[in-house]
Amino acid sequence: MTANYSTREYREKLYDDLHVRLRDTAILMCAIFIASIGLNMNSTAVIIGAMLISPLMTPIVGLGFGLAIFDTRLIKQSLEVLLTQVLVSLLVSTLYFWISPLSYASSELIARTSPTIWDVLIAIAGGIAGVIGSRKKEANNIVPGVAIATALMPPICTAGYGLANGNVRFLFGALYLFLINCVFIMLANIVGTRILMRKSPLSSFKELN
């Protein structure tokens, strides 16, 4: 039987994971670079690889978990890491598309500019699956699958393309898709966490202090 993290153990794990580290920033930059190339070359396989590498999911999960257990420290850490990662991602992707000799908008780029209700449903389902998968102590393929399904990397890179080419529609359309993904993954995490705790908010809060 697979062991799961308790609420307290999972909170401590997130405390440890949610820091702006050079190592994680380097990994993020590599993931953004790979995703940008994939979008530029219209290569789905390359984009999927970048999504598996990206650490963008962690602060969103941390934010949802922090809100679910009313933990201001975790909320602050998650926001700091997420904002830093978004800024780094925009910078790297903008620089890439600014120097790239391929300036045309591929179908992979265009697909990230018009969010639909399906994106909302995917983010919700992915967020719920992520809550379950991230609580397991043993390695599993749930969290990587969520990273692919919810596709956080491509919209950020597409926003970088919009900045590099002065295309407002690409910039705001992609940022809107990224925001939708973040918000609904976070909301699914809040609901999923409360369900998994199986206790009243008050007793759960006391248990964590």
Which residue stretches match the model-derived regions?
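Alpha-helical transmembrane segments and their membrane-interface boundaries
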Residues: 1-121, 136
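Alpha-helical scaffold segments in soluble metabolic enzymes
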Residues: 13, 36, 94, 128, ...
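Juxtamembrane transmembrane-helix termini
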Residues: 41, 100-103, 164, 194-200
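Transmembrane alpha-helical segments of integral membrane proteins
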Residues: 63-64, 157-160, 190-198
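Cytoplasmic membrane-interface regions of multi-pass membrane proteins
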Residues: 67, 72-73, 138, 195-203
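Juxtamembrane/interface motifs at transmembrane-helix termini
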Residues: 67-70, 80, 95-98, 164-165, ...
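Hydrophobic alpha-helical segments
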Residues: 113-186, 190
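Cytosolic-side transmembrane helix boundary signature
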Residues: 186-209
